[in-house]
Amino acid sequence: MLAQQHRMRAKAQFSKTTRSGARSGRRNLVLYTVKTPGETTSIGFIVSKSVGNAVTRNKTKRRLRELITPFVSKHPNGYSLVIRALPAAAHADYLQLSNDLDSALASVLKKLDAAPVAAQSPEATATSTTQGEEH
């Protein structure tokens, strides 16, 4: 069970994470992540009615909550994550969800680590393009 301090509840937090975060999709879920240095790691879940009825949605959330707990233990500060369950998650077993979440986490963390380099690349490209036009 996630501690209350790690639960994301505000709509603004969900919006910020899903709109400006790194994203990684898998068969059963989509993971959005933003680095939040100095803040407690917060986790939010989006499980829509397309996943199934209330019982199925809650079962899916419980599984995902249990699977993300080790990440929160390892990284108690510095991240904001939103996990959106896709309809296939309702029929996925625990191992499939675990593999998808681990894979998505690895991918997103890799993207976040590469983000500063990517942010510098367009500037360098724009500078070289501008210089090329002057000749």
Model-derived segments and their meaning:
Residues 1-135:
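Positively charged, solvent-exposed patches that mediate nucleic-acid binding
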